[in-house]
Amino acid sequence: MNRRFAAALVAGALSLPFAAAHAQILGPASDGHFKDTSMLKPPAGQRVAVVVFEDLECPACAAAHPIELQAAQQYHVPIVRYDFPLQMHVWSFEAAVFARYLQDKVNPALADEYRTQVFRNQISIASKDDLQNFTKQFMQKHGQAMPFVVDPGGKLAGEVKADYGVGLRLNVTRTPTIFVVENNGHYETISGNETGGADPNRLFPVIDAALKQTHNSAPAAVHTVARTTHK
């Protein structure tokens, strides 16, 4: 079976149909799927955030990505991204490491753009060589020199593995896993649990409800969506 088609089938199997739900922050997941939820909170000073565990080779993540960006920009809330490269995918780990290179060594905004472009061109990247060629073209287009060795000391790979470890502690089992989180410790799962829906469009009403629910909190500063490093 074609690897790309097989990956799409797996992603489809992991995405459960959307079940109608009220737009509200429910608190701890009722199905008990998620374990250590202590990290499900916005960055300091923010009332609400979108938390995403993603795999750059995941077709469902590629479909959700522009919706995440649109929702975050519309409501002026940050996106906190965790890399969760699935072992069945050929090049997703290397792509995550290079995104970290851009974030840490070049420009976080360029790292965001790299992730967006990888998702947009995902269907044409079938191997590590394809990813290397895509990345070289991306760097040239943005006036950057391609490093001879991206991660000589393994620090960036360690950051990606640390993100993956956070996902394991939370009990992430599929990608994308998406939450809307509040600064009062409440959250709602948009995608990724065992029993709920998987429609990223739910981000809009849930973020709206979360902002109303936290309206008495200190106002959040309006800012652009930024990539966040987790160690």
Where do the protein language model's features map onto the residues?
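N-terminal export leaders
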Residues: 1-10
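Structural alpha/beta surface segment adjacent to cysteine/selenocysteine redox centers
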Residues: 51, 56, 62-138
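C-terminal cap of thioredoxin/glutaredoxin-like
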Residues: 5, 136-231
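A short beta-strand-turn-helix
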Residues: 30-48
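Sec/Tat signal peptide C-region and signal peptidase I cleavage site
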Residues: 18-23
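Extracellular/periplasmic catalytic domains that process cell-envelope and extracellular macromolecules
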Residues: 42-45, 72-74, 91, 169-174
